From Swiss-Prot:
Protein name: Glycine--tRNA ligase
Sites where the protein binds ATP: 195-197, 205-210, 322-323, 441-444
Binding site for substrate: R97, E163, F210, T211, Q212, A213, E214, E437, P438, S439, F440, G441
UniProt family annotation: Belongs to the class-II aminoacyl-tRNA synthetase family.
InterPro entries the record matches: aa-tRNA-synt_IIb, aa-tRNA-synth_II, aa-tRNA-synth_II/BPL/LPL, Anticodon-bd, Anticodon-bd_dom_sf, Gly-tRNA_synthase/POLG2, Gly_tRNA_ligase_arc, GlyRS-like_core
């Protein structure tokens, strides 16, 4: 019988304290998972690796609320566009995600199709309810954000955040001041996000509450060469670009430098952070041959993205699973928040030398329009002052073409306006920064780290070959038998290792063979065994989880040796 890694891992996670479905005693709730003692430890280690990598890049961390006022998500586009297609059974009332139902029934990809198009496909192929066989409704869109209210008033609508990013964008003015108005700079946040998935399945792969680590890198769109790209240019990336997906050409492997030169990746700024993502996943313990970058098709991309590459990890059960997104969000978010809030979210870019530029200057001809516009003059003047150079150029073009324009509801002719082209010396310009966003999920890499670590030896031993510094229990101290003086010596070693900062357990129950199996199964890289030789010469054995080989070490050298073995 073939070993079912998924089923074994699900059992292992529940049985040994890694993770399990939430609210078990009340029948559970799909899309929610609890982390047990071992799982929570690994999850924290993943977060620590990501946090340390971000800090090494010079990014700084903030923390913002999970509950966010509705205005923020109106501005960000989530109220309008953060939706999935939904369909309901007219007979039993069961609801399903329409695109998934069509794909599972017909094997066709309907990503990007409208609700009307999906309804037509359902009707043409007579797709029925998977639960009861009943007729399905027309497809409509369901917003994935959890809705709530701030305080006792229904007019203070809010949402649980679907991403941590907006908390960074709305704080841009303060963050830019903290960064001393100097681009580029990065800000990250690690925290919970919430998406009210229609039908979450696949265990920990699709959750309604999950943890993200997102960094927003603010940069000048005219400066897209990363200053440290030379340090990473030779790193090999496995890519699956759009062209290769459409033509079924498979993946390609090439260096970061080649990826930019051949046009697969837009610039060295983008490529640099692809390498950063890959290195973080390797540091967590994901095997290199299980990592690839897939470029999202245009219809897959989020409403804010101009280009997105997903770092995917391979799963025996689920295939390639998206775990990290690298999205070019352009100036979408900051521009939207500027418009909605009225706040100035620009950055002043100072030139090395002053520039002479030609500018359009459009004002009202007061002699001509003053008598007829009267109190409206101020309003129209303010509108003209607020217009960008591009808007003024369009206004003049329209005036030349039609002989008139409408401003603030008032029709104005050529003679009503004074149009001049003036030269101006400028020291710099205000820009809305663009954003590149590496966005890590934590829960999916957690599960896929366990799946890719689960190993079966030739003799049938099942153990977790997790990267040693990612193990939830780093050391087990075991007396060979539960007798003095072995137990006292073992316990003293255990206490000393605790003080040295190891995650360590003491265990004297069952035979030594059973205990080795117990700790192999949860990935403990080393067992320190106090045996009958220990009282005679002050040495113990350190057993390696993967090879099962043992070395003898003096008790006083155990902490140093374990640090060397586990952390390098």
């Amino acid at each position: 019988m073939k070993f079912d890694k998924y089923e074994y891992l699900q059992d292992l996670m529940r049985r040994r304290g890694f993770a399990w479905g939430s609210f078990e005693i009340y029948g559970g709730a799909r899309g929610f998972y609890d982390y047990g003692p071992l799982g929570a430890t690994i999850k924290r280690k993943i977060e620590k690796k990501i946090r340390e990598a971000f800090i090494r890049e010079g990014f700084f961390e903030i923390e913002t609320p999970d509950i966010t006022p509705e205005q923020v998500f109106i501005a960000s586009g989530h109220v309008e566009k953060f939706v999935d297609p939904l369909v309901e059974c007219k007979k039993c009332g069961a609801r399903f995600r329409a695109d998934h139902l069509i794909e599972e029934t017909l094997g066709i990809d309907v990503e990007g199709k409208s609700a009307e198009e999906m309804t037509k496909i359902i009707r043409e192929h007579n797709i029925r309810c998977p639960e009861c066989g009943g007729e399905l409704s027309d497809v409509w869109y369901f917003n994935l954000m959890f809705e709530t209210y701030i305080g006792p008033y229904k007019d203070k609508k809010a949402y649980l955040r679907p991403e941590t990013a907006q908390g960074i964008f709305v704080n841009f003015k303060r963050l830019n001041a903290f960064a001393r108005n100097k681009l580029p700079f990065g800000v990250f946040q690690i925290g919970k996000a919430y998406r009210n998935e229609i039908s979450p399945r696949q265990g920990m792969i699709r959750l309604r509450e999950f943890t993200q680590a997102e960094v927003e890198i603010f940069f000048n769109p005219n400066e897209t060469e990363h200053p440290h790209f030379d340090e990473v240019k030779d790193e090999v990336l496995r890519l699956y670009p759009i062209e290769h997906q459409l033509k079924d050409l498979g993946m390609i492997e090439l260096t970061a430098e080649e990826a930019v030169k051949k046009g697969y990746v837009m610039n060295t700024f983008f490529a640099y952070y692809m390498v950063m993502i890959k290195r973080i996943l390797l540091d967590i313990g994901i095997p290199e041959d299980k990592i690839r970058f897939r470029q999202q098709l245009p219809e897959e991309r989020a409403h804010y993205s101009a280009d997105t590459w997903d770092a995917e990890i391979y799963s025996e059960r689920f295939g390639w699973v998206e775990c990290v997104g690298l999205a070019y969000r352009t100036d979408y978010d900051l521009s939207r928040h500027m418009k909605m809030s009225g706040a100035d979210l620009t950055v002043m870019i100072h030139y090395d030398k002053p520039k002479i530029v030609k500018k359009l200057n459009v004002t009202l001809n007061m002699k001509k329009v003053g008598p007829k516009l009267k109190e409206k003059v101020k309003e129209i003047n303010e509108k003209l002052k607020s217009m960008s150079q591009e808007e003024l150029r369009k206004l003049v073009e329209e005036l030349n073409a039609n002989g008139k324009v409408i401003i603030e509801g008032h029709e104005l002719e050529k003679e009503d306006l004074i149009i001049k082209e003036v030269e101006e010396k400028i020291q710099g310009e205000k820009i809305v920064p663009h954003v590149l966003e590496p966005s890590f999920g934590i829960d999916r890499p957690f599960y896929l780290l366990l799946e890719n670590s689960l190993t079966v030896d030739e003799d049938g031993r099942v153990y977790l070959k997790i990267k040693k510094d990612m193990a939830p229990i780093e050391v087990a101290v075991l007396p060979l038998v539960a007798k003095e003086p072995l137990t006292t010596i073992a316990y003293e070693i255990y206490r000393n290792l605790q003080k040295e900062g190891f995650i360590v357990v003491y265990d004297e129950k069952d035979s030594i063979g059973k205990r080795y199996m117990r700790y192999d199964e949860i990935g403990t890289p080393y067992c320190v065994t106090v045996d009958n030789q220990t009282p005679e010469d002050g040495t113990v054995t350190i057993r390696d989880r993967d090879t099962r080989e043992q070395i003898r070490v003096k008790i006083e050298e155990v902490p140093r040796k374990l640090k060397e073995l586990i952390f390098g």
